[in-house]
C-alpha cells in the first residue's frame, strides 16, 4: 500500500474516532446553550474582537475532495488553547460547520443569536453552524483547551509555520 494512502487512512481513522467522540461527548453532556427566553428572533450586532493569545495545533486533516461530490474541502481537527485573558476572535459558521469538545477549563461565548453570554465547560460538546457570529473568551486563571473539527476550503487551513508545537 502506498505511504500516502496509509497516512490518509490513519488520519481518517483518527478523524472519524474523534468526530464520533465529539458527537457523543465524552461525558454525554451538551454544552450550555442560550436560554430559550434569551434566543433572539434576529441576530444583534456584537463586538468584533481580535485574536488574543490563541494557540492552534492542527492534529489531522482529511482531504474530502471528490468524496460524494463534496468539492474541494477538508475536514480539519485542531487543538485550540485559550490562555487566561485570551480571546478566540469574532467569526461566523454560515459556511463552516464545526464540532467542539471542551477538554479543559471554562470559556464564555458571546453570540449574535443570544442576548446573554453562554458558558462552556470541560467535558461538554457543542455544534457551531448557521448564520450567526460569535467570539469566546477565557476569564479564568488557567488555560481552556478544546478540540475542534470543521469542514473548510484549503485556504482556511492554518499556516504550519504558526502552528503550536506538539
Where are these regions (language model features)?
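Short acidic-glycine-tyrosine-enriched beta hairpin
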Residues: 82, 113-131
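Short histidine-centered beta-strand/loop micro-motifs
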Residues: 88-93, 111, 118, 137-139
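A short, N-terminal "cap"/entry segment at the start of jelly-roll beta-barrel domains
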Residues: 2-4, 28-76, 117-119, 126, ...
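A short beta-loop-beta micro-motif enriched in histidine and acidic residues
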Residues: 70-73, 86-99
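Ligand-binding loop in jelly-roll beta-barrel domains
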Residues: 121, 130-156
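Bacterial Sec-dependent N-terminal signal peptides
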Residues: 2-14
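Glycine- and acidic-residue-biased ligand/ion/polar-headgroup-sensing regions
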Residues: 95-114
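Bacterial N-terminal signal peptides
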Residues: 11-25
Amino acid at each position: 500500500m502506498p505511504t500516502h494512502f496509509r497516512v490518509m487512512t490513519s488520519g481518517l481513522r483518527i478523524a472519524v474516532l474523534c468526530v464520533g467522540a465529539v458527537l457523543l461527548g465524552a461525558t454525554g453532556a451538551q454544552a450550555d446553550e442560550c436560554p430559550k427566553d434569551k434566543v433572539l428572533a434576529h441576530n444583534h450586532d456584537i463586538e468584533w474582537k481580535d485574536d488574543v493569545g490563541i494557540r492552534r495545533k492542527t492534529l489531522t486533516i482529511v482531504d474530502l475532495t471528490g468524496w460524494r461530490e463534496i468539492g474541494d474541502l477538508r475536514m480539519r481537527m485542531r487543538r485550540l488553547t485559550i490562555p487566561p485573558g485570551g480571546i478566540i476572535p469574532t467569526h461566523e459558521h454560515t459556511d463552516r460547520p464545526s464540532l467542539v469538545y471542551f477538554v479543559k477549563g471554562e470559556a464564555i461565548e458571546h453570540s449574535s443569536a443570544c442576548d446573554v453570554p453562554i458558558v462552556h465547560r470541560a467535558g461538554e460538546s457543542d455544534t457551531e453552524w448557521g448564520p450567526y457570529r460569535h467570539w469566546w473568551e477565557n476569564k479564568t486563571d488557567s488555560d481552556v483547551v478544546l478540540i475542534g473539527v470543521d469542514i473548510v476550503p484549503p485556504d482556511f487551513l492554518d499556516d504550519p509555520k504558526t502552528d503550536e508545537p506538539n
